[in-house]
Amino acid sequence: GQHITEGYGLSETSPVVTFNLAGRDEFTATIGIPMPSTDVTLRDDDGNEVAMGEPGELCVKGPQVMVGYWRKPEETAAVTTADGYFRTGDVAILNEEGRFKIVDRKKDMILVSGFNVYPNEIEAVVANMDSVLEAACIGVPDAQTDEAVKLFVVKMPEAEVNAEDVIAFCRENLTAYKVPKQIAFIDELPKSPVGKILRRELRD
């Protein structure tokens, strides 16, 4: 069969920002290393670079980055750092091999008592339950913690599972502040035509 190589890019950074080198047989679960002449940094909310292994917004500078949105200077300024990097809105980490891995979308991040919680991590944990087909979570207002995690669960056919079961499983596998406070069981998750979970519809 043909060898498939992963890459990462956006419309604003066409065609690609990072890639995995061809010829490597192992699956890295990363988006690889930066393209030539491309600089990628991970930054916190104050614009400072984060340490290796820490999550930060993926910012890009290179020949493939757009000049700006057509006749939309304010929108362009909103996604451009003071030193000229494009802010992708994706949260990533950098591993010891120099490879980047996407963690989540920054807009989907949940802030619980000042701690950053990434929905993908919680969803991946809950998906390991035998009784769960799939799951998705969002942040909801909470008087004590500003935001709390609300988890939507689609059960496996004929599975018997309740909210207490899910919360107990999360407590065994997640840090305390990441454990969902609310559980909702639904028949199916809203998705785009390509199968992407639409968290915005869950918020509505």
List PLM regions with ranges.
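Hydrophobic alpha-helical segments, especially N-terminal targeting/anchoring helices
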Residues: 43-44, 52, 80, 88, ...
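Conserved ATP/PPi-binding loop(s) of AMP-dependent carboxylate-activating enzymes
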Residues: 33-37, 48-79, 117
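AMP-binding/adenylate-forming catalytic core of the ANL superfamily
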Residues: 62, 67-68, 75, 91-178, ...
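Active-site glycine-centered loops adjacent to acidic/histidine catalytic or metal-binding residues
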Residues: 9, 32, 47, 90, ...
